[in-house]
C-alpha cells in the first residue's frame, strides 16, 4: 500500500507548519553542476532563479499575451484538483486486487510497471490515470518537465497549451481510451523516458475536486506494498518518476497524513541548476481545480529550455547538436525555438497561430525533404527558406495526421489538434512612400495552410517571374498567389506553369507584404505572404536610394545573359544574336572573326592600336576589331554555346586549346611592325569564363550609415546588419548569373548561399579594403570606412582585427582581380551539408571547373610550373584559413542576434531567417568544409 508521509526532519508533520525536502526522499534528482547558477529552494515552494537577461519574447515570443488570465490562482487550483483526482483513482486501481492491471510478479521491471500503471484499460471500476512526468537521463533535456519553470508565468501560458495538451471529452470506457492505452512507443525509449502527448478523442484525466486545507504541506510517497518489486522501488529512489496512487479500492478517503487530509495534490517541479530532471513535490493548493486538465501541461517551460546567456561556443555547439543530430525530427514543440529571431525583427512580427507559442521560423530539422508540402510543425528550416522544386496547391497542406515531435529515436504520429483562426486585423493606413503596397489581411481560413506552404524570399529572387503582368512603376508590388495556393507567383525561368488556373488565382490574390525591391528588376521580398500583422515595418524602401532601377540594367552587359532584356555584343555593343565562338557577339562580329581567322588576313592599325570599336565605327579598323575579338576570348575552334549557365560550357572550355600567353606588343612596336593575327599566334588572352565573372560583379553597395552622428555600438551594428542584408541580396543575384550554378537543385542553391554568405561578405570586404585603401582600413562601404581609431572605439575591436587579416593577406600576396573572382566562386562552393547535396555530381563538376579557372588566372601572371604551383598553394591556403576566421564571425553574429533586444540592434528580415536557420547547424559542426590542404 502506498502511503503518503509528511516530510520532516525528526518530528511528525503538523498541519500549517512549513516542510522542507529531506535528503534521501524517494523522488530526488541529481543536481547537475554546470556553468549556470543553481536555483535556491525556500521552505515551502521551489523558487526560480532569475535569468540575467530576460529572454521572454526574445527566443520564444509569447503569442497569447492578450489571453493571460487575470487571476493566477485559478489556474493553479485547476491543476491541483486534477492531480488529486488522478492520484486517488490510481491508488484505487492498485488496491483493487484483481482489478489492477499491474502484474504481481516480484521481478517485474520498471517498464512493465509504468506501462500498466499509466495505460491501464478503462473500465467500470477503473479510472484513467494521469501520465507520468517526462524523465530524461541525459544532461540535455529536449522537451520534458525537467526544465526550469517559472511559477508566476505558469498561468500566462496554460491557456496557450490547452489545445495541444488537454484531451477531448469522452467517457471512461469508450474505445478511444483503449486505443490510447495500446499506442506504439517511439523506438529506442522506455515508457518512463518519453513525452506522452494526448491524442484526439481520448477521455479526460478527470479528478474529483477536494476541499483543500489552508496551509500547504509537502508530502512524499513511500512504497510499502508487498506486491511491489524491489527493483521498482530502487529505481524510484534514484529519481524515476512514476504514477501516483491515492484511495483504497473500497472507495475510502485517500491515505494521507493529517497535514494533507482532504487536500488537493499537485506536482511542482523543482528547478535544477542546469538541465537535469527536477524533484517532484506534492504540494497542497488553496483551491480545487476543474477536472480535465493534465497537471504536467501547465507551462511552456515544461517543454522548452531557455539557455542563460552569454552562451559559450562549446555549449552552443553541444546544445545544437543535441537538437539537430536526429535525422527525422518532425515536431514543432520548440526544438529550434532557441534560435528564433527576436521580437524586434520583422520575421517575428507575423500573425500568431492560436495554440502555438512559437514563431513559424522555428521547426525541427528534416534530413531528407519530403514530397508533400512542409507542414506547420514539420521542419526545422523555416518555410520561408524551404524552396520546393514544384509549387503545390493548398490541399497538400491539409494532410493529416501530422508528425509531432516525441523525444526519442523516431517520431510518433499524433492527429491534428484544432487550431483557431487568427484574430481579424484592422485595415492598415494608406502607404506613405511611393510604390508601397497596401497590405491586406489574408482570409483566416487560409492562414495556416499558406503559412506552411508559402514561397521563400530566396525563391522570389532566384526564380524571377517571366510572365508577370506589367507593373505600375519601377517599384510596384509583384502579383502573388492566393493564400490557399501556397507560395508567391514566381515560377522558375525554365519551368512552365503547372496550374491552368494560375492566372485566375493571381487575380484574386492579396498583394505582397512589401513593395518590390527594385534590385535590377527583382521582386520584393516578404516573410510569409499570407501571414500578415498590423504595423509590420517596411524594411526595404531605404535601399532604393542605392540600387539601380530596371531602366539602367539594359544598358550594361554585366548580368546574366538569359535574364537580360537585351543581349549586348561584347565587341561592338550592338544587339547580340547569341554566343559565337565562346563570346556573346552580334552576327556581324561573328562573321568578321570567322573570315579574318580562316583567311589569315594581316591587318595593320593606322593609329596606335586603340581605335574605338562600336556599332558605327566597327568597320573603320579591322585590326583593332580583331584584337578586341581575341581579347574577349573568341576562339575559332570553340563550340557555339547556346547558354552560359550550363556545366557543359566549362567542360568544353577546358577542351579548347588556348595558346600559351605572351605579351602583346606595345604601342612603339606596333607602329614599327605589322601586327599579324593567325590561329596559331601566341596572344595573352583572358579566359572567357573569367571575363564573364568580371561582367557579373555586383555594383557598389552603400550601408546608409550616418557619419555625422557619433558612433555607438548599436548604431554601428545596425548599419552593418543593413549592409549585410543588401549584400546578401546581391549575393543571390550574383549566384543566379553564375555559370553552372542554376543547374544545381534548388535546395542545393539555397543551402550553398546560406552556408557561404558570411564568407563571401568578409572576402569582399577584404578586396575592397585592399583595392581602395591598400589594406590600411576596413572598407565596408563608401559611407562606412573604419580606420584603426574607429575600430578601437567600437565594441567589436577584436572582430575587426580578425577581419583585417584578409586585406593584409591580399597586400602580401598581391592578388589579381582574376584570381579574386575565381576564389570568390570557390568560396560559394566551399561548404556543403554532411550528407551531401542532391546534385552532388553537378556540384563537383562545377567546382572542378572553377579550380581550373583559378589555375588559368594564375597562369596569366606567373610563368613556369614551379611558380604557378607555389601561387596556387598560397591562394588555396588562404581559402582554407577563411573557415576558421568566418567561424568566429558566425559565433559573434549568433550571440548578437540572440541578444539583439538587449543590445538594441536591428536585424533585417532575410538575414534573420538565414541566421536562425543555418548558423546553429554551422556552429554545431553539422556541415562539411571542403579543404584544399590537410591541417
From Swiss-Prot:
Protein location: Nucleus; Cytoplasm
Quaternary assembly: Interacts with SMARD1 and UNC45A. Interacts with CUEDC2; the interaction promotes ubiquitination, decreases sumoylation, and represses transcriptional activity. Interacts with PIAS3; the interaction promotes sumoylation of PR in a hormone-dependent manner, inhibits DNA-binding, and alters nuclear export. Interacts with SP1; the interaction requires ligand-induced phosphorylation on Ser-345 by ERK1/2-MAPK. Interacts with PRMT2. Interacts with NCOA2 and NCOA1. Interacts with KLF9. Interacts with GTF2B.
Domain comment as written in the entry: Composed of three domains: a modulating N-terminal domain, a DNA-binding domain and a C-terminal ligand-binding domain.
InterPro entries in UniProt: NHR-like_dom_sf, Nucl_hrmn_rcpt_lig-bd, Nuclear_hormone_rcpt_NR3, Nuclear_hrmn_rcpt, Progest_rcpt, Znf_hrmn_rcpt, Znf_NHR/GATA
Renumbered residue ranges of the record's region AF3: 1-164
Species of the source: Sapajus apella (Brown-capped capuchin)
Name this protein carries in UniProt: Progesterone receptor
Covalent link location (Glycyl lysine isopeptide (Lys-Gly) (interchain with G-Cter in SUMO)): 388, 533
DNA-binding region, residues: 569-641
Motif LXXL motif 1 location, chain numbering: 55-59
Lineage of source species: Eukaryota, Metazoa, Chordata, Craniata, Vertebrata
Amino acid at each position: 500500500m502506498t502511503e503518503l508521509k509528511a516530510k520532516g526532519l525528526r518530528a511528525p508533520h503538523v498541519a500549517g507548519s512549513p516542510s522542507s525536502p529531506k535528503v534521501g526522499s524517494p523522488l530526488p534528482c541529481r543536481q547537475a553542476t554546470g556553468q549556470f547558477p543553481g536555483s535556491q529552494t525556500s521552505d515551502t515552494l521551489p523558487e526560480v532563479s532569475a535569468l540575467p537577461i530576460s529572454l521572454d519574447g526574445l527566443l520564444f515570443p509569447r503569442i497569447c499575451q492578450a489571453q493571460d488570465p487575470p487571476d493566477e490562482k485559478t489556474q493553479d487550483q485547476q491543476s491541483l484538483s486534477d492531480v488529486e483526482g488522478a492520484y486517488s483513482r490510481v491508488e484505487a486501481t492498485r488496491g483493487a486486487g484483481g482489478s489492477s492491471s499491474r502484474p504481481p510478479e516480484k521481478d517485474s521491471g520498471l517498464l512493465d510497471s509504468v506501462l500498466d500503471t499509466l495505460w491501464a484499460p478503462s473500465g467500470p471500476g477503473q479510472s484513467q490515470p494521469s501520465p507520468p512526468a517526462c524523465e530524461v537521463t541525459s544532461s540535455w533535456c529536449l522537451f520534458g518537465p525537467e526544465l526550469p519553470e517559472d511559477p508566476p508565468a505558469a498561468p500566462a501560458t496554460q491557456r496557450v497549451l490547452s489545445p495541444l495538451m488537454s484531451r477531448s471529452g469522452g467517457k471512461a470506457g469508450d474505445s478511444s481510451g483503449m486505443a490510447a492505452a495500446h499506442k506504439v512507443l517511439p523506438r529506442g525509449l522506455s515508457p518512463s523516458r518519453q513525452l506522452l502527448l494526448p491524442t484526439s478523442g481520448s477521455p479526460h484525466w478527470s479528478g474529483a475536486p477536494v476541499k483543500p486545507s489552508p496551509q500547504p504541506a509537502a508530502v512524499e510517497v513511500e512504497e510499502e506494498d508487498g506486491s511491489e518489486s524491489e527493483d521498482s522501488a530502487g529505481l524510484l529512489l534514484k529519481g524515476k518518476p512514476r504514477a501516483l496512487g491515492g484511495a483504497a479500492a473500497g472507495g475510502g478517503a485517500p491515505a494521507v497524513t493529517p497535514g494533507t487530509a482532504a487536500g488537493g495534490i499537485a506536482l511542482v517541479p523543482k528547478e535544477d541548476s542546469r538541465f537535469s530532471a527536477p524533484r517532484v513535490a506534492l504540494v497542497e493548493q488553496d483551491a480545487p481545480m476543474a477536472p480535465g486538465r493534465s497537471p504536467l501541461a501547465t507551462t511552456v517551460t515544461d517543454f522548452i529550455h531557455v539557455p542563460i546567456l552569454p552562451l559559450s561556443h562549446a555549449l552552443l555547439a553541444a546544445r545544437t547538436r543535441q537538437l539537430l543530430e536526429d535525422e527525422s525530427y518532425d515536431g514543432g514543440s520548440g526544438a529550434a525555438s532557441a534560435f528564433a529571431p527576436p521580437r524586434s525583427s520583422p520575421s517575428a512580427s507575423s500573425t500568431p497561430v492560436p495554440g502555438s507559442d512559437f514563431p513559424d521560423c522555428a521547426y525541427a530539422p528534416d534530413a531528407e525533404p519530403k514530397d508533400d508540402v512542409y507542414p506547420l510543425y514539420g521542419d526545422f528550416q523555416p518555410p520561408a527558406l524551404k524552396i520546393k522544386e514544384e509549387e503545390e496547391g493548398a490541399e497538400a497542406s491539409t494532410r493529416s495526421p501530422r508528425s509531432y515531435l516525441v523525444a526519442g529515436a523516431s517520431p510518433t504520429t499524433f492527429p491534428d489538434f484544432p487550431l483557431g483562426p487568427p484574430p481579424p486585423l484592422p485595415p492598415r493606413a494608406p502607404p506613405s512612400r511611393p510604390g508601397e503596397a497596401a497590405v491586406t489581411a489574408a482570409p483566416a481560413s487560409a492562414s495556416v495552410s499558406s503559412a506552411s506552404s508559402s514561397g521563400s524570399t530566396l525563391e522570389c529572387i532566384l526564380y524571377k517571374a517571366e510572365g508577370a503582368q506589367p507593373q505600375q512603376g519601377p517599384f510596384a508590388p509583384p502579383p502573388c498567389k492566393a493564400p490557399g495556393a501556397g507560395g508567391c507567383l514566381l515560377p522558375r525561368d525554365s519551368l512552365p506553369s503547372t496550374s491552368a488556373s494560375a492566372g485566375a488565382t493571381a487575380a484574386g490574390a492579396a498583394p505582397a507584404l512589401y513593395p518590390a525591391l527594385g534590385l535590377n528588376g527583382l521582386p520584393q521580398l516578404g516573410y510569409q505572404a499570407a501571414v500578415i500583422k498590423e504595423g509590420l515595418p517596411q524594411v526595404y524602401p531605404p535601399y532604393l536610394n542605392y540600387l539601380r532601377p530596371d531602366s539602367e540594367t539594359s544598358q550594361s552587359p554585366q548580368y546574366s545573359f538569359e535574364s537580360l532584356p537585351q543581349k549586348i555584343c561584347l565587341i561592338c555593343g550592338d544587339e547580340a544574336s547569341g554566343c559565337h565562338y565562346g563570346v556573346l557577339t552580334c552576327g556581324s562580329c561573328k562573321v568578321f572573326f570567322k573570315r579574318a581567322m580562316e583567311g589569315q588576313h594581316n591587318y595593320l592599325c593606322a593609329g596606335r592600336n586603340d581605335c574605338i570599336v562600336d556599332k558605327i565605327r566597327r568597320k573603320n579598323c579591322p585590326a583593332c576589331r580583331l584584337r578586341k575579338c581575341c581579347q574577349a576570348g573568341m576562339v575559332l575552334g570553340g563550340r557555339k554555346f547556346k547558354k552560359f549557365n550550363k556545366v557543359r560550357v566549362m567542360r568544353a572550355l577546358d577542351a579548347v586549346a588556348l595558346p600559351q600567353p605572351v605579351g602583346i606588343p606595345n604601342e612603339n612596336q606596333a607602329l614599327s611592325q605589322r601586327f599579324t593575327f593567325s590561329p596559331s599566334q601566341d596572344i595573352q588572352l583572358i579566359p572567357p569564363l573569367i571575363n564573364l565573372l568580371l561582367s557579373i560583379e555586383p555594383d557598389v553597395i552603400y550601408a546608409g550609415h550616418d557619419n555625422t552622428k557619433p558612433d555607438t555600438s548599436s548604431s554601428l551594428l545596425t548599419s552593418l546588419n543593413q549592409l549585410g542584408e543588401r549584400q546578401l541580396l546581391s549575393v543571390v543575384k550574383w549566384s543566379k548569373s553564375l555559370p553552372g550554378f542554376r543547374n544545381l537543385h534548388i535546395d542545393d542553391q539555397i543551402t550553398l548561399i546560406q552556408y557561404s554568405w558570411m564568407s563571401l561578405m568578409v572576402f569582399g570586404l577584404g578586396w575592397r579594403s585592399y583595392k581602395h585603401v591598400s589594406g590600411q582600413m576596413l572598407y565596408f562601404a563608401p559611407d562606412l570606412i573604419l580606420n584603426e581609431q574607429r575600430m578601437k572605439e567600437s565594441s567589436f575591436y577584436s572582430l575587426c582585427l580578425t577581419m583585417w587579416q584578409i586585406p593584409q593577406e591580399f597586400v602580401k600576396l598581391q592578388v589579381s582581380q582574376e584570381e579574386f573572382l575565381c576564389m570568390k566562386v570557390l568560396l560559394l562552393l566551399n561548404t556543403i551539408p554532411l550528407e551531401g547535396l542532391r546534385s552532388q555530381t553537378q556540384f563537383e563538376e562545377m567546382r572542378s571547373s572553377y579550380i581550373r579557372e583559378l589555375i588559368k588566372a594564375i597562369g596569366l601572371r606567373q610563368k613556369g610550373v614551379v611558380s604557378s604551383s607555389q601561387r596556387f598553394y598560397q591562394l588555396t591556403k588562404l581559402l582554407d584559413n577563411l573557415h576558421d576566421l568566418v567561424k568566429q564571425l558566425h559565433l559573434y553574429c549568433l550571440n548578437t542576434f540572440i541578444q539583439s533586444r538587449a543590445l538594441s540592434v536591428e536585424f533585417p528580415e532575410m538575414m534573420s531567417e538565414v541566421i536562425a536557420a543555418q548558423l546553429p547547424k554551422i556552429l554545431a559542426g553539422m556541415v562539411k568544409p571542403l579543404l584544399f590542404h590537410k591541417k
